[in-house]
Amino acid sequence: MKTALILLSILGMACAFSMKNLHRRVKIEDSEENGVFKYRPRYYLYKHAYFYPHLKRFPVQGSSDSSEENGDDSSEEEEEEEETSNEGENNEESNEDEDSEAENTTLSATTLGYGEDATPGTGYTGLAAIQLPKKAGDITNKATKEKESDEEEEEEEEGNENEESEAEVDENEQGINGTSTNSTEAENGNGSSGGDNGEEGEEESVTGANAEDTTETGRQGKGTSKTTTSPNGGFEPTTPPQVYRTTSPPFGKTTTVEYEGEYEYTGANEYDNGYEIYESENGEPRGDNYRAYEDEYSYFKGQGYDGYDGQNYYHHQ
């Protein structure tokens, strides 16, 4: 019994002494000086970048607080419940207002191009992953309606293009005779109908004038590049206007010699001697050009940093 008590007392003293040293070391390490000069990371894993920030975000750690883990799980469950409730609400609203839903679903993230069918599984991803694929028959009906509306729009556009082309042909036939397109439109009533606006008539007249110029130039000889103007005023090739206080150089000549006085010449014309003279006559500072710099500092090329005048600096202190 005595030996057992003695051993227990010795063991308790050793444990108390070791714990005392541990607490003392922790307090010393928490000081500001040791935090700056003696940085020893408390946890070995924090030395590595891929373990930092704190490990409570990762499920690998087994010693994290159970309350935090339970909190994360509960938050995930709440999010799932919210998603399911949103899905239920969307289903109810879809049953009540089908027309409004049809308008909203067409505003999807990826709009369909012309001629593409909306499949019931992949079409209408307007509310990403929340909206469920439902009522394939309604979706196909919507797709057929869209097709019909697109075909009607195309037919209207083709009809308008045909009318414009016919009007341009009539204007070209009358413009070749020398009469102006505006007068023919006013007299004969071609071009713009009674229901069209005045702006459309003006645009058609401009296109007709351009067509007149092209037809007249095509009738002339192919060797001549000169354009003749139409009797109604046409277009003449003009040279671009000169900028104020500038003189254009003659054709085929450069501006380096004759027009040198107009520009400020900032190059090194006086001191540019091809980097061949070490000490120039013009008082150029040493080291200003590369050749002089290389000649001046090539003395130190073969020597190490510790060699001065053939002596080792650290061995002669």
Swiss-Prot record:
The keyword Acetylation does not apply. N-glycosylated; glycans consist of sialylated and core-fucosylated bi-, tri- and tetraantennary chains. Changing residue 288 to E: Modestly reduces cell attachment activity. The modification Sulfotyrosine is found at residues 313-314. Residues 58-254 are annotated as: Disordered. Keywords: Biomineralization, Cell adhesion, Glycoprotein, Phosphoprotein, Secreted, Sialic acid, Signal, Sulfation. Residues 66-102, 149-173 have a biased composition (Acidic residues). Residues 222-232 have a biased composition (Polar residues). One of its GO terms (cellular component) is extracellular space. The Arg-Gly-Asp (RGD) sequence serves as an integrin-binding motif and is required for integrin-mediated cell attachment. Monomer. Interacts with integrins; the interaction promotes cell adhesion. This is Integrin-binding sialoprotein.
